[in-house]
């Protein structure tokens, strides 16, 4: 489980800016212990535990990038065509002990090892073959159409840094240097539950003032997409003692506990008090909209050696989504040993006017369309309440308004974050 100190997220201000939150996580939260070796076919989505060093060069030998003729560049005329004798033939995979001599060319195919002495390859469609000779044109640069040993990755270099979240391309690189297994961090173990007397299980009996619980399903899907092992603890009622017991029990065997609902200041919002009764709630408001009431802290189990990070999210599902991708995800990456992720909002033209308060980061759900001039522009969803789930299903991503922005007008450019980028 996560070994955390009570002040690991410590912040003394009333509203925590997102940049300060990310800095505190990076400085004061340590990755969980535990490393395991997995085969390449099971490695996607896992986090490398150590630097992966290339045991061989990539490519391991000089080879041709095309079907054509290997030559010595020193033999080529700068004034016109050069006629060379075709002295051999090399296929991909064939063991080559051929050495090219002055005035010769070797017929070669893509991937075949370059003959000793050759440094340049002419594509077959650029030459003229006449019996046992080939005429090659002037102007080709030394090394053209050739792939040299180690140009992709020299032997002994870092192929994959520690903290890499492995995707298909990383697994392919590991295979290309001959590896069959990788050492990765163990998966994070995360417990989730929803709170509220008004929340019921989907498919269950719903009285007139109740709503079906969507938040646990949203959180489970997001967590599993990021590689965590999820324990679903269901729905807890608004009972302070019951919440405290559930939190205390959930800290055992889990690295992180994530809840939704009950972190605001209402009379029925008991999560904050429950956390403070069994641990430390070190901040509970972040300068973000939607989702300002976000609690983060540490909860302790029955044993003094057991503790888990805690995040309490708001109850509205859109606020849950936004705060998860911008608050929980950086914490997950740090706990899992992954390198920090830098989001790069792409500037798009805004097709609406908007005003916001200063000193908070704000996210607006938008769809992308082509303007009359063909340029991409963002259109705000007509309903922007934090409980409007269709505002997530009917849009393409979020516009990110920085803390110092107070208004935008049609035609302004604002950073756009796609849902795919936010969730991966």
Model-derived regions: residue spans:
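Flexible glycine/proline-rich
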Residues: 19-22, 36-41, 50, 63, ...
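Helix-rich terminal scaffold detector
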Residues: 1-18, 180-313, 317-323, 334
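Intrinsically disordered, low-complexity, positively charged segments
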Residues: 11-73, 77-81
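Short, glycine/charged-enriched hinge/interface segments at domain edges or termini
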Residues: 2-19, 69-232, 237, 377, ...
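Structural signal for hydrophobic packing residues in well-ordered secondary-structure cores
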Residues: 29-33, 51, 114, 157-163, ...
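Solvent-exposed alpha-helices and their adjacent loops that cap or buttress functional pockets
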Residues: 62-64, 76-79, 97-101, 114-116, ...
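Generic structural signal for well-ordered, non-membrane alpha-helical segments
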Residues: 14, 18-22, 36, 40, ...
